[in-house]
Design a protein with these regions (language model features):
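C-terminal structural segments of small proteins and small subunits
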Residues: 56-89
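Intrinsic-disorder/low-complexity, polar/charged segments enriched in Ser/Thr/Lys/Arg/Asp/Glu/Gln
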Residues: 1-5, 60-62
Length: 89
């Protein structure tokens, strides 16, 4: 199991498009992927769960991966956050 705190740095936070990209990325891996914010833990493979976190810019999420490809999943998710979900701002 890997856990890391990841900041939300894109201007619009985890809005619908960013949530969809996150869910799509998480779903590409066999391992379990969870996000936690303010005590609420959700499955990152569920777009409704991800959007329920209402994570705006400046929020910090705990990302947890657990399973056979956990490191690859964590690397991909960290890159997605760092790249601002491809939004460039």
């Amino acid at each position: 199991m890997i856990k890391k705190n990841v900041p939300v740095v894109n201007k619009l936070g985890l809005h619908a498009r960013a949530s969809a990209k996150l869910t799509q990325t998480a779903s590409a891996f066999k391992c379990g992927v969870w996000l936690t914010r303010n005590g609420r833990r959700v499955n990152a493979k569920s777009i409704m769960g991800v959007m329920m976190l209402a994570a705006g810019i400046g929020s910090t999420l705990e990302v947890e991966t657990d399973g056979e490809d956990e490191q690859a999943a964590m690397d991909a998710l960290e890159k997605l956050f760092a790249d601002k979900f491809g939004e460039g701002s």
